[in-house]
Amino acid sequence: MKKDGSSGSFGIKASPGSLSRAVSWINFSSLSRQTKRLFRSDGELSVCGHQVEADDENWIYRTQPRKAVSNLDEESRWTVHYTAPWHQQENVFLPATRPPCVEDLHRQAKLNLKSVLRECDKLRQDGCRSSQYYSQGPTFAAGSSPCDDYQDEDTEADRKCSLSSSEEERFIGIRRPKTPTSGDFSDLHTQTNWTKSLPLPTPEEKTRQQAQTVQADVVPINITASATGQDDDGSAHSLYVPDHYSTLGRLDSYRSTGQCLETRDTSCQTEDVKVIPPSMRRIRAHKGVGVAAQMSHLSGSSGNMSVLSDSAGVVFPSRLSNDTGFHSLPRTGPRASTYSLEGRMGALGSTEDTDDTSPYQGGSLQGHENFAHLGGASSTGMLSRPKSQQLRFLESPACVVSPHAAYSTSVIPNATLLSSSEVIVIHTAQSAGQLDSRTPGSSSYSKIKPRDRPTPRCSVKDDHQSPRHHWNEGHLIHSRALASSVPGATTLLSLHDSEVSLNAPANRENGSQAILYHCRNNPSFPDHPSDVDGKSECSYSGDRGCGSSEPWEYKTSSNGRASPLKPHLATPGCSTPTSNVSSCSLDQTSLKGDTRSLCSEDHDGYYTTTHEAGNLYTLSDGLGNPRHSMVNVFDGRAQRSQGDQAAHQDKILSRNISLKKAKKPPLPPSRTDSLRRIPKKNNQTNGQVLNESLIASLQHSLQLSLPGKGGSSPSQSPCSDFEEPWLPRSRSQSIVSEGSSLTSTTTPNVYSLCGVTPSQSDTSSVKSEYTDPWGYYIDYTSLQEDPGNPTGGCSANTEAATGNGPVRHIQEGSRVPVPQVPGCSVRPKIASPEKSQRVTSPSSGYSSQSNTPTALTPVPVFLKSMSPANGKGKAKPKVPERKSSLISSMSISSSSTSLSSNTSTEGSGTMKKLDTTLASALAPPPPPLPPLPSPCLADKSPFLPPPPPLADCSEGSPLPPSPMFPPPPPEALVPFCSPTDGCLSPSPTAVSPSLPRSLPPVPAPPPFLPSSEPPPAPPLDPKLMKENRPFFKNSSQSESSREALRRPANKEEGCRPPMPLITTEALQMVQLRPVRKNSGAGAVLFSEPSAQEQRTPTAPQYHLKPSAFLKSRNSINEMESESQAASVTSSLPMPAKSQSQGDHDSAVERGGLPSCSDGAPGPGPSLRTTLLPDSSPSRKPPPISKKPKLFLVVPPPQRDFTAEPTENGSEAFPGVPSPTRAEGEAVRSQEEKSSPASRAGSHATAPTPGSPALEPGTAGSLSSSIVEANVPMVQPNTSPGPTQEESGENSVDGERNAKSCLSQQGREAGLLEPNTAASSSDPVDVSKEEGSDEVLTPTKPRTTEDLFAAIHRSKRKVLGRKDSEDDHTRNHSPSPPVTPTSAAPNLASPKQVGSIQRSIKKSTTSSDNFKALLLKKGSRSDTSARMSAAEMLKSTDPRFQRSRSEPSADSPDSPSSCSPNKNRRAQEEWAKNEGLMPRSLSFSGPRYSRSRTPPSAASSRYSMRNRIQSSPMTVISEGEGEPAEPADNKARRALDATRVCSLDRLTGQEMDQASLLCSEEPASVDGIGRAEGNGPSEQCGGTEQKS
């Protein structure tokens, strides 16, 4: 019937529809009247429908005998007034005297005007119509039909102001019911005219319609089955959606455009137009499949595709079947289809299945079969939705949930539904009953039910028809069984609701598990083309086409989510997530992936999606609780299936989140999408088998909070793999568009991720809080590690990048283990760092910044993070990253850091390699670092994918995870560090293979030193650990904790995963206790132990150390510095100097300011010696390489410092200042000299020579270089050969960091103040002495100073400390110690100058808060002014700028300017050299990290401050001298004139970096605020969070 109506009436209407739309402005009145007529009398409509159609088609501007009221009539009056000859002539235009042609023209003009007016009025919806002003009735020449009476009627009505407004409303009201009623659907076909004719409903109208439509739609849901005929049309239409991958906006368009869009989406406007007639029906479609579904479809091109595309597909079939209920079907159906679900399940499943399926079957049912087979994703092109709906109503529970979830959470469910098609099929087995049962419980489930129903119907049919869809079949059977045993289904549904897959798993596990499992296995088994197809990333669409190709009408569609997302539709979740999920999840089980997407919503409270996912899980895993029940999820393959499902769920959740988010911020998802696409490409399906055991092991370990190296490690790889897809999933889901983009890229990964995801899902305990992210991440973590070993790298990165903060943690955490495991090798596969980065961005619960900041890498999804877990508001919001200071934050923080690390590190060129490296080894660390504020979370994340272990984060519990986590901390520590560290720490052993692989992607070995570093890295790591231990011993305060961390780290040192142990602890300690609790040195030391432990294991620990360090304010700078250092490290990892310094820096950062400094020297020399020879390229120091200069410069002194209590950084500093000054200068000179060598060779050779020289002066230099190390880290990161710059910039940045650290410590403990003061003079002298040596220093310090000033203020404000004291301590004490510490006068000079100037200005300035910043800026400017002409030239010289000046020029640039500049340049250079952007990562990382854990206390304040600082920093970067310091300004201007060129080039980068630093530093400064809420600071959050 619908087909007939649609085909007949609609076929006619297709033309009129477009015509009427084209002519709508002119024809609007007639359309309106027709619409009114349609609404007024359905009978008349039925009679007139075709006539109206004819009218529309034959739209003629008929002269309407009605009084032709035109201006000419009035003109005639005027003519009377003006009786001029021409006026008299005008009489010709009078109606009586006009020639017929003129009359026609007038009439047409009137009509057009009136039509336009009417249309405008309709749009106005205020009841007052412009047309009413014209008392002429609607001059719709459109009424050339028997409806002319109606035209007159309408005219009269139009004349009545109330009629147009009230009747229009009435129309709307009537229209809604008509739309929903299937009887009306006949009318709708008739009404298709009015739908065509009707203008899109105004928002109000839409809202009204939707409101009215919902109930009416409930009934039509049944008709979903009827949509078979339309389904075929839908197939064509469905194809349309695939084109809209980034249809998030389109999603909105769908929603806003609603009818029109849907029509277009259907591709077969005929059908869609038909649907369009009931504007509300369109809206209904939005509702049922509805906005969420459509969004999902649009964004995911999955659900929405289903809905929109599926207008032809599932939704459309449903709707078409239900003529009226097509749109309303998804809406009302899912909501009100509880009865429908069951009835439909039975009726549609059986009867309707046959009926609908028969038409559907012809073109769509087979597709549905494929759907079922392909998880409904395969044939989801357009069948996906139908399948979704048909299958779904077998799987109604999931489907229903999904639509609602899709609606509620996002369209994702629908998108998921596409995935859900398969998922639903899986669910159908268990979901049919479940959904039915659940449907009553939650309208949202009901909602999907209708769609589910059609899908299940199809599925049932398919199952019956095609054993080929064994899972579909089995699951269909299950569905039937479930339907039969609705009680159990209800329980399942209930559980599914809360834990979609918990109960369902039991149910499903029993009967359908094998099938679902089989399905899940299908990915493994070629048997399931869908799975197999899904497995193939892109193939999946094609494969899906293959799988569903037989039935798939849009086999064409199937070819690509590209063309029609129909296949994607089939894997709608894969589209965004659906394309990913489809590819991955759907790959696993087309169904599963989509289900995952679907299930994702589950967490959102739209357990519907989760339910689907859960059902999928259950089906695939037989694990009822994919999300919450980690253990179940870990069912080897089942787990992987579940993992996929979980990934899908998570993704869907994310996607739902993002879909929700997508409505408004779909764009970031788009970006994510782009990023994801890149990463998704890794088809991380391998390791499915491994996934089983590894996941099981991981699951156990995660659940037990044990290190579970075996499980953990596997978990990480899969986690990585999964994370990426997961992230995309989440993100993807959140960003349907992204999903569509990701579809191709993420698909394979998603598949892997999907497999892993369940693991995370299972880890639902943790996931409870971050249900979405954690569960999935954890799940997929364990799951994906093994299967995703190849994808692990990518996945790990993805995990790191995974939008869900928790997810990211888990991913990172999981990822960390991956490096330990062979997965490391696989990781390179995952090595698409972009993935990680991309994921990171989305993954970071902080999706916006993630996405936005990801200048380096399309931070894709951290919409997902934000959206993945983030976008979802539910899971992500659940994981308040900002609130997740500790545990919660841990996961989010980890995610954030990971995101930021991944994003920053992987940001660009580096991103890939870094991502690989990080994914392999470092990926895990980044999350911990970002979550530094929440080390537990971070720790738990990798080790304990399950969120609960996350809570475990205590030193003991996290330690096990920590081993995995240290790598994340490295990455988190700073993107710059993480690349190297990640590679080195986890990578050296496990990631070694991966790193090499990564390294190839990142050609420049220095950037990562992965290939060469990985093997040496372990030695380095142990050495670092051992060295760090002495270092830690120096910090007796943290000694025990350090030892604790160290021991686990050492224990796992060989494994590298132990690093995460430390990382977690370090993160926890640093973030929670040390940063906030420890006053200064205590906090620093505490952080240091954690970080050091982290570092002890290796760079990861080092990173963690920096995390701890970041805990101190220095940490933030270090983060930034480190991120740059990562780049530099990549460039200069080889240089012993760089390495040693890097290590030292790491130690310094680890120990806070002085503590780290002390600790670093011990490991520094050893590291230099050992690392240089042993793993010059690939030793942990490579990340340290970021701070290599410092390290090299500082190692011996650092040891000295180690001997001296680091806490008393000033002690060390005071003692060191003279050596620092003398040796610092020498060091700086050497470093500068060595810098070119480092630059040129980027090897330890050049740096090594410099290193010995540097070492002597480094003692003092490093003391202050603790911070310096941080800055140098940034600077080394900046350039392949930032050695010189490192020494100078390290000094500057280190000084800045040291200041930061010292002032932070001083602020916190006041310990460093005296010491700082004591060293202040020396540092000042050194700074002055070395200012000429390191002209770079002045500029850099200024920016650094500026940042610090801002940070100081922020922290002071947050902490309520006095500005003057803080400023003094920080500016003076920290700066001087830093200066002496940074034997390189570079740091001392810029910083000291800044310090001195600040001191002077301080005395002068009454308002320290405000003026301190200005003064700091001034000092920075002063520093830059002090830059020697040679240095200025260097900085200005483009050659120096990019190559040597990257470190060198940056150094001249103000610290902040330099750092960001350096970071940027480093990113650029790294991108050029390595293809990764450590700086970018670092850049992004700090931002994300910061945002991740935005200072709750002053979130707004921080964001404002950050922004303000960003602005000043930028200005400083540009001008190098802000108006703040007149004197300094002059010098700065002089310097700037020379440096302008370089700055201009670097300004953008610097601005970003500066803003990063600003954001980062304030957060760092606010040890408490930072950990508590770094939201605004998330830009720098990555860095700061570590702090």
Swiss-Prot record:
Sites bearing Phosphothreonine, chain numbering: T1379
Residue ranges, compositional bias (Polar residues): 179-196, 431-446, 573-584, 730-750, 757-767, 792-801, 838-855, 1089-1099, 1112-1141, 1275-1285, 1392-1409, 1576-1587
Key words, A-Z: Phosphoprotein
UniProt feature, compositional bias: Pro residues: 923-934, 958-972, 998-1021
Residue ranges with Low complexity bias: 705-720, 885-911, 1448-1460, 1484-1503
Entry's family note: Belongs to the NHS family.
Protein name: NHS-like protein 1
Species this chain originates from: Mus musculus (Mouse)
